Regions:
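Bacterial Sec-dependent signal peptides at the C-terminal "C-region" and cleavage site
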Residues: 11-22
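Substrate-binding cleft of extracellular glycoside hydrolase catalytic domains
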Residues: 20-147
Protein backbone atom coordinates (compact mmCIF):
# COMPACT_ATOMS: atom_id res chain seq x y z
CA UNK A 1 0.00 0.00 0.00
CA UNK A 2 2.83 2.40 0.92
CA UNK A 3 4.56 1.72 -2.40
CA UNK A 4 1.34 2.34 -4.32
CA UNK A 5 0.76 5.57 -2.39
CA UNK A 6 4.29 6.77 -3.11
CA UNK A 7 3.92 5.95 -6.79
CA UNK A 8 0.64 7.84 -6.93
CA UNK A 9 2.23 10.88 -5.30
CA UNK A 10 5.11 10.81 -7.75
CA UNK A 11 2.73 10.67 -10.72
CA UNK A 12 0.64 13.49 -9.29
CA UNK A 13 3.77 15.59 -8.73
CA UNK A 14 4.98 15.04 -12.28
CA UNK A 15 1.59 16.11 -13.64
CA UNK A 16 1.62 19.18 -11.41
CA UNK A 17 5.08 20.31 -12.52
CA UNK A 18 4.20 19.72 -16.16
CA UNK A 19 1.38 22.23 -16.03
CA UNK A 20 1.86 25.57 -17.78
CA UNK A 21 2.32 28.61 -15.57
CA UNK A 22 3.09 32.30 -15.96
CA UNK A 23 6.77 31.62 -16.67
CA UNK A 24 6.57 28.06 -18.02
CA UNK A 25 5.02 27.31 -21.42
CA UNK A 26 2.12 29.65 -20.78
CA UNK A 27 0.88 29.03 -24.32
CA UNK A 28 -0.14 25.50 -23.29
CA UNK A 29 -2.76 27.02 -21.00
CA UNK A 30 -5.85 26.63 -23.17
CA UNK A 31 -7.63 29.49 -21.38
CA UNK A 32 -4.91 32.00 -22.32
CA UNK A 33 -5.39 34.27 -25.34
CA UNK A 34 -3.03 34.15 -28.33
CA UNK A 35 -2.07 37.36 -30.15
CA UNK A 36 -0.43 37.58 -33.56
CA UNK A 37 1.98 40.40 -34.40
CA UNK A 38 2.59 40.36 -38.15
CA UNK A 39 4.28 42.79 -40.50
CA UNK A 40 4.15 43.19 -44.27
CA UNK A 41 6.53 40.25 -44.81
CA UNK A 42 4.13 37.75 -43.22
CA UNK A 43 1.42 35.91 -45.13
CA UNK A 44 -1.96 35.43 -43.45
CA UNK A 45 -4.94 33.32 -44.46
CA UNK A 46 -7.63 34.86 -42.26
CA UNK A 47 -10.19 32.16 -43.02
CA UNK A 48 -7.78 29.56 -41.65
CA UNK A 49 -6.76 31.68 -38.66
CA UNK A 50 -10.42 31.78 -37.61
CA UNK A 51 -10.21 28.06 -36.85
CA UNK A 52 -8.10 28.85 -33.78
CA UNK A 53 -10.54 30.35 -31.29
CA UNK A 54 -7.72 31.35 -28.94
CA UNK A 55 -6.45 33.93 -31.44
CA UNK A 56 -8.45 37.01 -30.48
CA UNK A 57 -6.13 39.94 -31.22
CA UNK A 58 -3.57 41.26 -33.68
CA UNK A 59 -0.84 43.81 -33.00
CA UNK A 60 0.53 44.77 -36.40
CA UNK A 61 3.65 46.72 -37.26
CA UNK A 62 2.57 50.20 -38.34
CA UNK A 63 5.81 52.13 -38.65
CA UNK A 64 9.57 51.88 -38.37
CA UNK A 65 11.26 55.21 -37.95
CA UNK A 66 9.57 57.21 -40.69
CA UNK A 67 8.54 54.29 -42.88
CA UNK A 68 5.07 52.75 -43.03
CA UNK A 69 4.25 49.05 -43.20
CA UNK A 70 2.59 48.57 -46.60
CA UNK A 71 -0.06 46.13 -45.35
CA UNK A 72 -0.98 47.87 -42.12
CA UNK A 73 -4.07 49.81 -43.15
CA UNK A 74 -5.72 47.11 -45.26
CA UNK A 75 -5.10 44.43 -42.63
CA UNK A 76 -6.50 46.62 -39.87
CA UNK A 77 -9.73 47.08 -41.77
CA UNK A 78 -10.00 43.38 -42.54
CA UNK A 79 -9.09 42.14 -39.06
CA UNK A 80 -11.46 44.49 -37.24
CA UNK A 81 -14.30 43.61 -39.62
CA UNK A 82 -13.74 39.96 -38.68
CA UNK A 83 -13.97 40.64 -34.96
CA UNK A 84 -10.31 40.73 -33.93
CA UNK A 85 -9.04 43.16 -31.35
CA UNK A 86 -6.48 45.44 -33.00
CA UNK A 87 -3.25 47.09 -32.00
CA UNK A 88 -0.15 48.51 -33.62
CA UNK A 89 3.52 48.98 -32.86
CA UNK A 90 6.28 51.36 -33.83
CA UNK A 91 9.80 50.01 -34.25
CA UNK A 92 11.95 52.72 -32.74
CA UNK A 93 15.17 53.90 -34.36
CA UNK A 94 17.77 56.53 -33.42
CA UNK A 95 16.53 60.03 -34.11
CA UNK A 96 13.96 62.52 -32.90
CA UNK A 97 11.50 60.54 -30.70
CA UNK A 98 8.74 63.16 -30.80
CA UNK A 99 8.75 63.21 -34.58
CA UNK A 100 8.71 59.40 -34.58
CA UNK A 101 5.77 59.30 -32.17
CA UNK A 102 3.84 61.84 -34.22
CA UNK A 103 4.55 59.95 -37.43
CA UNK A 104 3.45 56.69 -35.83
CA UNK A 105 0.17 58.21 -34.68
CA UNK A 106 -0.40 59.79 -38.08
CA UNK A 107 -0.53 56.23 -39.48
CA UNK A 108 -2.08 54.32 -36.57
CA UNK A 109 -4.50 57.09 -35.68
CA UNK A 110 -5.82 57.98 -32.24
CA UNK A 111 -8.42 55.31 -31.57
CA UNK A 112 -9.98 54.42 -28.24
CA UNK A 113 -10.22 50.71 -29.05
CA UNK A 114 -6.64 50.06 -30.20
CA UNK A 115 -3.43 49.14 -28.39
CA UNK A 116 -0.22 51.10 -28.99
CA UNK A 117 3.29 49.73 -28.54
CA UNK A 118 6.94 50.73 -28.83
CA UNK A 119 9.40 48.11 -30.07
CA UNK A 120 12.92 48.52 -28.62
CA UNK A 121 14.82 45.84 -30.49
CA UNK A 122 18.27 46.03 -28.90
CA UNK A 123 20.61 48.01 -26.65
CA UNK A 124 22.75 49.41 -29.47
CA UNK A 125 21.91 53.15 -29.66
CA UNK A 126 23.19 53.32 -33.24
CA UNK A 127 20.58 50.86 -34.51
CA UNK A 128 17.69 51.07 -32.03
CA UNK A 129 15.92 53.83 -30.11
CA UNK A 130 18.00 54.74 -27.02
CA UNK A 131 16.27 54.51 -23.65
CA UNK A 132 16.26 58.27 -23.02
CA UNK A 133 14.57 58.76 -26.39
CA UNK A 134 12.12 55.96 -25.55
CA UNK A 135 11.03 57.89 -22.44
CA UNK A 136 10.28 60.94 -24.60
CA UNK A 137 8.43 58.77 -27.13
CA UNK A 138 6.31 57.12 -24.43
CA UNK A 139 5.38 60.45 -22.86
CA UNK A 140 4.42 61.81 -26.28
CA UNK A 141 2.10 58.87 -26.92
CA UNK A 142 0.51 59.40 -23.52
CA UNK A 143 0.13 63.12 -24.20
CA UNK A 144 -1.63 62.45 -27.49
CA UNK A 145 -3.74 59.40 -26.57
CA UNK A 146 -4.12 59.42 -22.79
CA UNK A 147 -2.71 55.89 -22.62
CA UNK A 148 0.75 54.42 -22.18
CA UNK A 149 2.01 52.11 -24.91
CA UNK A 150 3.21 48.58 -24.38
CA UNK A 151 7.00 48.31 -24.36
CA UNK A 152 8.34 45.43 -26.44
CA UNK A 153 11.80 44.22 -25.48
CA UNK A 154 13.93 41.13 -25.10
CA UNK A 155 15.86 40.03 -22.02
CA UNK A 156 18.92 42.19 -22.72
CA UNK A 157 16.85 45.33 -23.23
CA UNK A 158 14.73 44.61 -20.16
CA UNK A 159 17.84 44.13 -18.03
CA UNK A 160 19.34 47.34 -19.42
CA UNK A 161 16.17 49.23 -18.49
CA UNK A 162 16.25 47.71 -15.00
CA UNK A 163 19.88 48.77 -14.53
CA UNK A 164 19.53 52.31 -15.85
CA UNK A 165 16.16 53.55 -14.56
CA UNK A 166 14.36 53.43 -11.22
CA UNK A 167 11.02 52.00 -10.22
CA UNK A 168 9.29 55.36 -10.71
CA UNK A 169 10.30 55.59 -14.35
CA UNK A 170 7.64 55.97 -17.02
CA UNK A 171 8.63 52.48 -18.18
CA UNK A 172 6.89 51.07 -15.10
CA UNK A 173 3.61 52.59 -16.31
CA UNK A 174 3.79 50.69 -19.60
CA UNK A 175 2.67 47.07 -19.92
CA UNK A 176 5.58 44.76 -20.75
CA UNK A 177 5.63 42.86 -24.04
CA UNK A 178 8.43 40.39 -23.42
CA UNK A 179 10.28 38.52 -26.16
CA UNK A 180 11.79 35.24 -24.98
CA UNK A 181 11.95 32.20 -27.23
CA UNK A 182 12.30 29.41 -24.71
CA UNK A 183 10.00 27.17 -22.71
CA UNK A 184 10.77 28.77 -19.36
CA UNK A 185 11.77 32.17 -18.02
CA UNK A 186 13.86 31.40 -14.91
CA UNK A 187 15.60 34.79 -14.73
CA UNK A 188 12.86 37.40 -15.15
CA UNK A 189 14.03 40.80 -13.89
CA UNK A 190 11.23 42.20 -11.72
CA UNK A 191 12.65 45.58 -10.72
CA UNK A 192 10.57 47.64 -13.19
CA UNK A 193 7.94 45.10 -14.21
CA UNK A 194 6.62 42.53 -11.75
CA UNK A 195 5.16 40.51 -14.60
CA UNK A 196 4.80 40.52 -18.36
CA UNK A 197 1.53 41.31 -20.11
CA UNK A 198 2.42 39.60 -23.39
CA UNK A 199 5.07 36.94 -23.91
CA UNK A 200 6.32 36.66 -27.48
CA UNK A 201 7.28 33.01 -27.41
CA UNK A 202 7.41 31.98 -31.07
CA UNK A 203 9.04 33.32 -34.23
CA UNK A 204 11.26 32.03 -37.02
CA UNK A 205 13.92 31.51 -34.33
CA UNK A 206 12.11 28.52 -32.83
CA UNK A 207 9.35 27.65 -35.29
CA UNK A 208 10.34 26.09 -38.60
CA UNK A 209 7.17 24.18 -39.38
CA UNK A 210 4.00 22.70 -37.97
CA UNK A 211 5.85 19.81 -36.31
CA UNK A 212 8.67 21.95 -34.94
CA UNK A 213 6.90 24.88 -33.35
CA UNK A 214 5.82 25.72 -29.78
CA UNK A 215 2.35 26.65 -31.03
CA UNK A 216 0.96 26.52 -34.55
CA UNK A 217 -1.79 28.84 -35.76
CA UNK A 218 -3.52 27.69 -38.97
CA UNK A 219 -3.25 30.19 -41.79
CA UNK A 220 0.20 31.36 -40.71
CA UNK A 221 3.72 30.13 -41.31
CA UNK A 222 6.75 29.56 -39.12
CA UNK A 223 8.03 33.11 -39.20
CA UNK A 224 4.78 34.58 -37.89
CA UNK A 225 5.41 35.95 -34.40
CA UNK A 226 3.02 34.62 -31.77
CA UNK A 227 2.34 35.85 -28.26
CA UNK A 228 0.46 34.63 -25.23
CA UNK A 229 -1.47 36.92 -22.92
CA UNK A 230 -0.85 36.69 -19.19
CA UNK A 231 -4.52 36.11 -18.51
CA UNK A 232 -7.57 34.45 -20.00
CA UNK A 233 -9.25 35.03 -23.34
CA UNK A 234 -12.21 36.65 -21.61
CA UNK A 235 -9.96 38.92 -19.54
CA UNK A 236 -8.18 40.14 -22.65
CA UNK A 237 -11.44 40.83 -24.45
CA UNK A 238 -12.85 42.69 -21.45
CA UNK A 239 -9.75 44.82 -20.81
CA UNK A 240 -8.68 45.67 -24.35
CA UNK A 241 -7.11 48.12 -25.08
CA UNK A 242 -6.15 48.72 -21.42
CA UNK A 243 -4.33 45.45 -21.01
Amino acid sequence: MRILLLASLMIASSILFAQPSEFTQKWLDTTAAIILDPYQGNDIDWDQVKNDKRVVAVIHKATQGFKTDKKYLTRREFAKSHGYKWGSYHLGIPGNPIKQADYYLSIAGINSDEVYALDIEDINPTTSMPLDSAVIFINRIYEKTGRYPLVYCNRLVQESISQKVDENSVFAKCPLWYARFRKEIPDFSSKIWKKYTLWQFSSELNCSGRKNCPYWVPGTNGYMDKNVYNGTIQELQNRWPDI
